[in-house]
């Protein structure tokens, strides 16, 4: 099991844009996807980006909500992929797979602090933590 942390985004828009592209890849292989977002504002921005990408690419997958779950605080259920851009997720359930991604942002101190705590908790559990600077 491994969790990938992405960092180095210029702002929230770029982080959500990258997240949206990653989610679209999951839709192509019909994964059940969970997205943990900081709050309603980020959910609105994610929805805006999904629609924008649909109009730019004409790929219907961006409009598919059937296999997409969004949360703001805790995980319930099993997922093929988990994407986290939240300040409320500091630990993860034990039944994770290699398709867990965490997006961090220096300009959002709450998300950055929660990501650091999550990183520490995962390392203490012996989870393989990967880091990629974007």
Residue ranges with predicted function:
Residues 3, 32-34, 81:
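Residue-level preference for the first positions of well-ordered beta-strands
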Residues 1-15:
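Glycine-rich phosphate-binding "P-loop"
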Residues 63-102:
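Mid-chain, well-packed structural core segment of small domains
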Residues 99-134:
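Glycine-rich, aromatic-bearing surface loops/beta-hairpins
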Residues 16-63:
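Short, well-structured hydrophobic secondary-structure segments
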Residues 8, 36-40, 84-88, 105-107:
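Structural motif
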Residues 45-46, 74-75, 115-116, 120:
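Active-site acidic carboxylates
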Residues 56-73, 129-134:
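A generic structural motif
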């Amino acid at each position: 099991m491994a969790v990938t942390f992405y960092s180095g985004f210029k702002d929230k828009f770029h982080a959500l844009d990258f997240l949206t592209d990653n989610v679209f890849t999951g839709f192509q292989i019909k994964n059940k996807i969970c997205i943990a977002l900081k709050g309603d504002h980020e959910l609105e921005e994610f929805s805006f980006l999904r629609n924008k990408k649909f109009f730019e690419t004409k790929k219907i997958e961006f409009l598919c909500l059937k296999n997409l779950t969004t949360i703001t605080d805790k995980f319930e259920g099993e997922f093929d992929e988990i994407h986290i851009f939240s300040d409320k997720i500091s630990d993860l359930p034990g039944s994770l797979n290699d398709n867990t991604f965490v997006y961090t942002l220096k300009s959002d101190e709450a998300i950055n602090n929660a990501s650091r705590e999550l990183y520490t908790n995962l390392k203490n559990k012996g989870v393989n933590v990967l880091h990629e600077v974007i």
